[in-house]
């Protein structure tokens, strides 16, 4: 049986309306056990200022972003279940959900799935990687009872 341990950190000023710890746990449980038996993940919910600072420092992008993934890399010869950290910006997630006419809960779930796949080594730098990652995201979201997060883009094509 797989086990995903969640460390949820609420670093944003307003906690009202945020998904609860059980929801974040369910979303992690929907993705990570498909790839590894044990994992520890920190999810830190932040405001735009912290997201902006981290995005600028680590990605060179001068704006806040929806989710940042920081995979843990253990020193050689040491095995630990620590998968890494997800930094999710509340305001960006809420704004994107509204702009994209997506249910807010579904967009939160998508950000956890998307970020978790980054922690597991997936990326979307080139078209083939993006297609593989988006396909996995869609499969996982559908399995958890949500719509395809890319349906609007697919319809537009």
From Swiss-Prot:
Similarity-based family: Belongs to the endoribonuclease YbeY family.
PANTHER family in UniProt: ENDORIBONUCLEASE YBEY, CHLOROPLASTIC
Top-rank taxon, per record: Bacteria
Pfam families: YbeY (PF02130)
Binding site residues for Zn(2+): 114, 118, 124
NCBIfam families documented for this protein: rRNA maturation RNase YbeY (TIGR00043)
Enzyme Commission code(s) on record: 3.1.-.-
Enzyme superclass (EC): hydrolase
GO terms classed as biological process: rRNA processing
InterPro entries on file: MetalPrtase_cat_dom_sf_prd (IPR023091), YbeY (IPR002036), YbeY_CS (IPR020549)
Keywords from the named record: Cytoplasm, Endonuclease, Hydrolase, Metal-binding, Nuclease, Ribosome biogenesis, rRNA processing, Zinc
Named cofactor requirement(s): Zn(2+)
Metal-binding as UniProt keyword: yes
Cellular localisation: Cytoplasm
Gene this protein is translated from: ybeY
Protein name from the UniProt record: Endoribonuclease YbeY
Presence of the UniProt keyword Hydrolase in the record: yes
Residues annotated as transmembrane: none
Cofactor note: Binds 1 zinc ion.
Organism: Salmonella dublin (strain CT_02021853)
Record's function text: Single strand-specific metallo-endoribonuclease involved in late-stage 70S ribosome quality control and in maturation of the 3' terminus of the 16S rRNA.
GO molecular function, one term: metalloendopeptidase activity
Gene Ontology cellular component terms for the protein in this record: cytoplasm
